[in-house]
């Protein structure tokens, strides 16, 4: 029986990235829907799983994506609400790649290391940064997330990121530094620093992180020049620089692709798997 993946994307055009990776992971048929709202999910999901007997539903799954993480979470909730009795299919949420990226990076950082009690600072309060903060906290880290000030972003039209409110809801300590100096001061006593800023924005200077005596490990999520952390190469795979281990965006990305494909394959091993942030992290811990 063919493996069918129903792609529910909250954007107008379903992600070609997610579609191609699905095929590379072994999906036979991809049914892609764009501009999906939670209200539309029930008919789409039930229209899919009613075509097969309950014993055959492991050959069908749902992928939730798009650029809006909050909307994606609502769609995933609606997918699960559409289930009843034996009629359920596995589902995964990875809007904007937030879950696979964060899970992979933290799995790489945590591999073979005891993170309990370590101080971690996340620069940037977007979806990937906050997912990373949550996972680091689960590993026992003392976590601080900081926003990126206007002088670092290079803009005169700064607005308070909505991620601050999300951080508060998640119980993550977050600060909004007024300028670069205040942001860099927040890195004092940090053992781990993750740069999760916009593409092409350098958020951390080499002279700052190289001189930090407590800093042990840095990771950069930005693969576009200039990179997020000065002095780190995109391909750095936990190599040592200035006495600290550094992880570049391409090293994270390569492992992320393996995790992404493994997650898709696992969706078809049973019909009741839900891969949210925690579920994806469990897969990442097995893969990296």
Segments predicted by a language model, with ranges:
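Conserved active-site and cofactor/substrate-binding residues in soluble primary-metabolism enzymes
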Residues: 35-39, 70-74, 100, 104, ...
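Adenosine-phosphate binding glycine-rich loop
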Residues: 224-288
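Glycine-rich phosphate/diphosphate-binding loop of Rossmann-like nucleotide-binding domains
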Residues: 110-192
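Glycine/charged-rich beta-loop-alpha catalytic/anionic-binding loops adjacent to active sites
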Residues: 84-92, 241-245
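N-terminal ligand-binding/catalytic initiation module
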Residues: 1-87, 279-288
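Short glycine/serine/threonine-rich phosphate/pyrophosphate-binding segments
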Residues: 102, 127-132, 201-204, 227
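A glycine-rich, Thr/Ser-enriched phosphate-binding loop motif common to dinucleotide/cofactor-binding enzymes
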Residues: 92-110
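Rossmann-like adenosine-cofactor binding region
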Residues: 172-246
């Amino acid at each position: 029986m063919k493996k069918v993946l129903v792609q529910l994307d909250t954007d107008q055009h379903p992600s070609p990235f997610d579609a191609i990776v699905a095929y590379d992971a072994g999906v036979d048929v991809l049914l892609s829907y764009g501009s999906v709202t939670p209200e539309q999910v029930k008919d789409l999901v039930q229209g899919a799983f009613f075509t097969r007997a309950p014993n055959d539903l492991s050959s069908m799954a749902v992928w939730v994506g798009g650029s809006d993480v909050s909307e994606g979470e609502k769609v995933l909730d609606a997918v699960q609400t559409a289930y009843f009795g034996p009629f359920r299919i596995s589902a995964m949420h990875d809007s904007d790649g937030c879950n696979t990226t964060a899970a992979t990076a933290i799995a790489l950082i945590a591999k073979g290391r005891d993170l309990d009690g370590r101080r971690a600072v996340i620069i940037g309060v977007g979806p990937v940064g906050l997912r990373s903060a949550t996972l680091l906290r689960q590993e026992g880290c003392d976590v601080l997330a900081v926003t990126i000030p206007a002088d670092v972003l290079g803009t005169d039209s700064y607005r308070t990121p909505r991620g601050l409110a999300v951080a508060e809801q998640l119980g993550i300590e977050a600060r909004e530094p007024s300028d670069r100096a205040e942001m860099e001061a927040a890195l004092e006593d940090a053992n781990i620093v993750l740069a999760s800023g916009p593409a092409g924005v350098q958020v951390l200077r080499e002279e700052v992180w190289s001189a930090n005596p407590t800093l042990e490990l840095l990771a950069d999520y930005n693969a576009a020049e200039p990179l997020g952390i000065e002095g780190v190469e995109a391909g750095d795979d936990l190599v040592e620089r200035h006495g600290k281990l550094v992880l570049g965006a391409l090293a994270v990305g390569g492992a992320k692709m393996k995790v992404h494909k493994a997650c898709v394959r696992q969706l078809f091993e049973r019909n009741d798997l839900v891969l949210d942030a925690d579920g994806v992290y469990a897969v990442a811990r097995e893969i990296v």
